[in-house]
Amino acid sequence: MAIEENIKTSKKDKKSPPMLHVLRSFDINRPGLSINKLNGGVLGGTLSKGTFSIDEDIEIRPGHLNKKTNKYEPIYSKISSLGSSAGLMESVNPGGLIAVGTKLDPSLTKSDSLVGAVVGYPNEVADTHENLDVKIDLFDVAIGSPDMIKVDKIKNKEALRLNAGTAITAGLVTNVKNDIVTIALRRPITAEYNSRIAISRRLGDRWRLIGVGVIS
């Protein structure tokens, strides 16, 4: 096919440790269900690499906020079911949207409370960052702005919004050196080094995409 000559289908990496970006999280239990019939919390998202199988142990990062220490702590659980548009499965490969049933207390997953988290095998999940060093590449004009606003250089103490995988967080620039920007995050994110993020700046009453960056 001609399209394959110009835009090749990416190869699926099944050998690396799995990495699932959580796009939705649910409590699927109906009100009033008896305790012995409760299902664990469900995570929905895309498996970008690796494979998952039922009964495997998983780690979820950043996890939940410990209100005593004001720090996020990883959550550990086990896969109880796997599903896709094709139905229930024993194992899943990269690509497409999947649902991961877990043995988590459903109160941890209700109302999309784990959106933006990353799921993998214990001790093999990417690092969680409270501060980021980002090599930036700014656009000429802000994307989505009807006025074709020119993108100025990022300044120290400027507020930015970052998108990494399915995670969205705000941050404050604490240092700018050439094309490397250090950002203190309001909420930590879990992301691999050398992964790409989207950078937005508030222009008027909306956030506008102004560039991309690579976590260094």
What are these regions (language model features)?
Residues P106-S216:
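C-terminal effector modules of nucleic-acid-centric enzymes and ribosome-associated factors
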Residues M1-D112, V118:
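Conserved catalytic-core segments of large NTP-driven translation/proteostasis enzymes
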